[in-house]
């Protein structure tokens, strides 16, 4: 039976009272776990429906932390202050960055959706648009994107924030669990893993190489396998370096100044910090990459996206909403997060869909020009793809 976004949200709510991936009633004898609401969050494995691709989700405890960096921290930038106290509920975060193995099934949907459109299979009507996504068109210059390889265990890179968000909508609906990109506060909390230092393993940049793959040790060789690094105290790999990671927040020139008065009354929620992003760019990218200096890999470091530069050599008009063509794009990826508390429909859609007028114009322009398209996502999609490829009716 087809599962829509509405049904997904209802299912997720119902499952919270029963058998849910990553939640158990008894405390495990070993391994990481987080007690919450009389149950225990534990690691679990996601298998992308219709594939044999798997990735692991790790429970992260809730808590409070000081977000941003003090003026005295080497590498501090004005947009990292003033520091504010933030609280977060527990969540699961992907253990590694999204790999090409994880991302390519989503990339493959572009040709699937175009063929479905030609054959009038699973047509996208107005009433079904709530369940629709776009899939990334084929790469303009794959030799550039894949210069350092496209091995399944290398991190997927050069996708836009919009593409990352559409990926999370797809995997949420086909899997029956609600995934999204992290807020910046959630990401930084997970990266710090209980630390208040510049890096999760201290303040000394000379020791960063123990955990991170960045300019000093990558030597321009490109990213490493997503499982190659040493986990932080929460069990997450490469929160510093390898590839920088998209988060949902926009970047303001005054940093967290607009939140200072509100934060004086007590810790802010991660959604208070995020606000309501409404600009196409700059959006925040966190963690630094194999191209970055140690200071650019700090937990508090913030990189603002600049699509005017990062898509400079894209010859298309409008430029691709799904891919970037210029550095530092080969050092940018993402990882997914799942909240312990499912978000209501109107809120989760802000994490999944178009959220700025400029982006809407780009997406609409590409689709009207025949260089993009929509497809319906539900739990029947993997079987529909299988039947189509095998010639079954």
Protein language model annotation of sequence segments:
Residues 18-46:
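Primarily auto-inhibitory N-terminal propeptides
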Residues 18-25, 69-75, 87-201, 249-253, ...:
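Active-site microenvironments of metalloenzymes and redox enzymes
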Residues 50-67:
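Mature N-terminal segment immediately following signal peptide/propeptide cleavage
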């Amino acid at each position: 039976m087809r599962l829509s976004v509405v049904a997904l949200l209802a299912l997720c709510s119902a499952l919270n009272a029963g058998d849910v991936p990553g939640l158990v009633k008894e405390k495990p004898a070993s391994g990481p776990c987080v007690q919450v609401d009389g149950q225990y969050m534990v690691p679990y494995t996601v298998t992308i429906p219709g594939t044999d691709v798997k990735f692991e989700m790790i429970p992260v405890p809730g808590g409070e932390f000081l977000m941003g960096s003090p003026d005295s921290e080497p590498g501090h930038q004005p947009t990292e202050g003033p520091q504010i106290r933030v609280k977060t509920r527990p969540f699961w975060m992907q253990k590694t960055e999204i790999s090409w193995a994880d991302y390519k099934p989503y990339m493959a949907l572009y040709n699937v959706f175009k063929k479905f459109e030609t054959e009038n299979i699973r047509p996208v009507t107005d009433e079904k648009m709530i369940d629709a996504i776009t899939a990334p068109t084929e790469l303009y210059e794959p030799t550039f994107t894949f210069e350092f390889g496209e091995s399944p265990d290398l991190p997927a890179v050069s996708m836009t924030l919009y593409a990352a968000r559409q990926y999370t909508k797809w995997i949420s609906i086909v899997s029956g669990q609600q995934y999204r990109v992290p807020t910046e506060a959630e990401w930084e909390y997970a990266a710090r893993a209980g630390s208040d230092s510049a890096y999760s393993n201290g303040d000394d940049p000379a020791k960063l190489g123990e955990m991170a793959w960045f300019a000093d040790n990558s030597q321009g060789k490109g990213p490493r396998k997503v499982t190659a690094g040493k986990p932080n105290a929460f069990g997450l790999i490469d929160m510093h370096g390898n590839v920088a990671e998209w988060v949902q927040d926009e970047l303001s020139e005054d940093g967290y100044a607009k939140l200072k008065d509100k934060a004086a009354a007590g810790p802010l929620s991660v959604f208070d910090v995020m606000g309501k992003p409404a600009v196409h760019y700059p959006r925040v990218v966190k963690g630094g990459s194999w191209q970055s200096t140690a200071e650019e890999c700090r937990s508090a470091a913030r990189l603002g996206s600049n699509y005017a530069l990062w898509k400079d050599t894209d010859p298309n008009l409008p430029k691709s909403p799904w891919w970037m063509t210029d550095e530092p794009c080969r050092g940018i990826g993402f990882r997914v997060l799942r909240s312990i508390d499912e978000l209501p429909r109107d809120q989760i859609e802000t994490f999944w869909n178009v959220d700025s007028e400029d982006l809407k114009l780009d997406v609409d322009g590409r689709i009207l020009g025949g260089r993009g398209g929509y497809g319906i996502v539900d739990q029947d999609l993997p079987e529909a793809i299988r039947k189509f490829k095998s010639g079954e009716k």
